[in-house]
Curated annotation (Swiss-Prot):
Keyword ATP-binding: yes
NCBIfam families: asnA (TIGR00669)
Enzyme nomenclature, EC number: 6.3.1.1
GO biological process, one term: L-asparagine biosynthetic process
Pathway(s) the chain acts in: Amino-acid biosynthesis; L-asparagine biosynthesis; L-asparagine from L-aspartate (ammonia route): step 1/1
Disulfide bond is among the record's keywords: no
Name of this protein: Aspartate--ammonia ligase
EC supergroup of this enzyme: ligase
Assigned GO CC terms: cytosol
Catalytic activity: L-aspartate + NH4(+) + ATP = L-asparagine + AMP + diphosphate + H(+)
Assigned keywords, A-Z: Amino-acid biosynthesis, Asparagine biosynthesis, ATP-binding, Cytoplasm, Ligase, Nucleotide-binding
Species name: Ligilactobacillus salivarius (strain UCC118)
Length: 336
């Protein structure tokens, strides 16, 4: 358990005012995001069959919450980690065409999460996915989409400032781009990727770190990524320097999704070629699924960022270790 306690923390809003601000941010953002990105809202599952291969393996070691159902004997059901793969299949199932897309409210349980100021076992995010052409699977498409998302987030700052002027946290005016290898080259003295993210975000304010998942020159990965949804050459994280906690805050992980070639290449690198026999993977190999770009935007993270909160538990209801709750309360951090 890692917990940062900011000095002389002032939550600015009462718990009830915070709840009202959360409602406003969530409702306003999803409407503006959907409109700006050209996305339709759809309903999404909270759990899927393990045999489908649809669940997100995240970094590879997290185990999903699973159970069995009376009317589906012999089938293991898993609570989703994310909807990264499900969304791509939904675009096909619902008949979405080129440059059309969807977003959904995704709720997940990640029981193996390391709990801290930003991380909870309960995950709530806007999961989105959009159809692109094979020719658009490039860095230009990725960067243009990142710029669009940043524009919506920045506009939300002004919306919140108007409604809650004393509480809003001000954001930088521009997002910068750097690859994970360029970041390692820039800070050779910093061995930990998180330290490099903190350094670049403190310098530039907001950064999109690109190309996450593959091994760097150092022999290490910047961060783990499942080999079967993001193309590791065309993905990244949106990070903000977060002054209240003096570190980087990751708002979104996103990317252009694997095609039939990059998926096989990445599965070979991780030794997960056995997944190629699963339904989702077969559909990609057979070119039955559309080429897409997609990602997730943390709902609680966005609320935390825009309201300058010290702990994600101030903007979402979850469960936390007693020691963490005690320290938070002693320092004016009111956990819901």
């Amino acid at each position: 358990m890692d917990l940062i306690i900011p000095k002389d923390y002032d939550p600015k809003l009462s718990i009830r005012e915070t709840q009202e601000a959360i409602r406003y941010i969530r409702e306003t953002f999803q409407d503006e995001f959907g409109k700006e990105m050209g996305l339709n809202r759809v309903s999404a599952p909270m759990y899927v069959e393990k045999s489908s291969g649809i669940n997100d393996n995240l970094n590879g070691y997290e185990k999903p919450v699973s159970f069995t159902m009376k009317d589906m004997p012999g089938e293991t059901i898993e609570v989703v980690h994310s909807l990264a793969k499900w969304k791509r299949m939904a675009l096909k199932k619902y008949g979405f065409g080129l440059h059309e897309g969807l977003y959904t409210n995704m709720n997940a349980i990640r029981k193996d999460e390391d709990l801290d100021n930003f991380h909870s076992s309960y995950v709530d995010q806007w999961d989105w996915e959009k159809v692109i052409s094979k020719d658009e699977r490039n860095e230009k498409t990725l960067k243009e989409t990142v710029e669009l998302i940043f524009k919506v987030v920045k506009h939300m700052e002004h919306e919140v400032w108007y409604k809650f002027p004393n509480a809003v946290y001000h954001l930088p005016d521009k997002i910068h781009f750097i690859t994970s290898q360029e970041l390692e080259d820039k800070y050779p003295e910093l061995e930990d990727a998180k330290d490099r993210e903190n350094a670049i975000c403190k310098e530039l304010g907001c950064v999109f770190v690109m190309q996450i998942g593959d091994v760097l020159k150092s022999g290490k990965r910047h961060d783990g990524r499942a080999p079967d949804y993001d193309d590791w050459k065309l993905n990244g994280d949106i990070l903000f320097w977060y002054e209240p906690l003096q570190c980087a805050l990751e708002l979104s992980s996103m990317g252009i999704r694997v095609d039939e070639d990059s998926m096989v290449e990445q599965l070979k690198k991780t030794g997960d070629e056995d997944r190629l026999k699963l339904q989702y993977h077969k559909m990609i190999l057979n070119k039955e699924l559309p080429y897409t770009i997609g990602g997730g935007i943390g709902q609680s993270r966005l609320c935390m960022l825009l309201l300058g909160k010290a702990h994600v538990g101030e903007v979402q209801a979850s469960i936390w270790p007693d020691e963490m709750l005690k320290k938070c309360e002693e320092n004016g951090i009111h956990i819901l």
